[in-house]
């Protein structure tokens, strides 16, 4: 089976990319167990706790990231540099992740057979 990589690089709620990415992951997990998920750039903002999207009339899909564990999706990586540049610490995040360097992210992405970017 092919290794699938999902990359989140967009801020939440400004577009539908985050919600569509989460939906794509959950759908793909029915067919593949070899899935890696990456949060880079503004994509790290997708995982922040205590977001209130209803205040800007957006749908709350962020809590859906908690479902990744139920789907046995454990290879979830965030970019250390992106978190540092935005003053984000791991305890601010909604789910457990592995914080890794840009180099490690690039290495892992190079091992994916298919990559989808959101």
Curated annotation (Swiss-Prot):
Keywords: Cytoplasm. This is Protein TusC homolog. SUPFAM superfamilies: DsrEFH-like. Transmembrane segments: none annotated. Pfam families: DsrE. The keyword Cell membrane does not apply. InterPro entries: DsrEFH-like, Sulphur_relay_DsrE/F-like, Sulphur_relay_TusC/DsrF. Could be part of a sulfur-relay system. Its main location: cytoplasm. It is found in: Cytoplasm.
């Amino acid at each position: 089976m092919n290794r699938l990589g999902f990359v989140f690089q967009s801020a939440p709620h400004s577009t539908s990319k985050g919600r569509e990415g989460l939906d794509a992951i959950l759908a793909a997990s029915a067919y593949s167990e070899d899935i890696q998920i990456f949060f880079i750039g503004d994509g790290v903002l997708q995982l922040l706790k205590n977001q209130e999207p209803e205040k800007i009339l957006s749908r709350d899909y962020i809590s859906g990231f908690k479902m990744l564990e139920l789907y046995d999706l454990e290879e979830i990586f965030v970019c250390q540099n992106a978190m540092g540049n935005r003053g984000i610490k791991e305890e601010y995040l909604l789910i457990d992740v592995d914080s890794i360097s840009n180099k490690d992210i690039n290495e892992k992405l190079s091992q994916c057979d298919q990559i989808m970017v959101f």
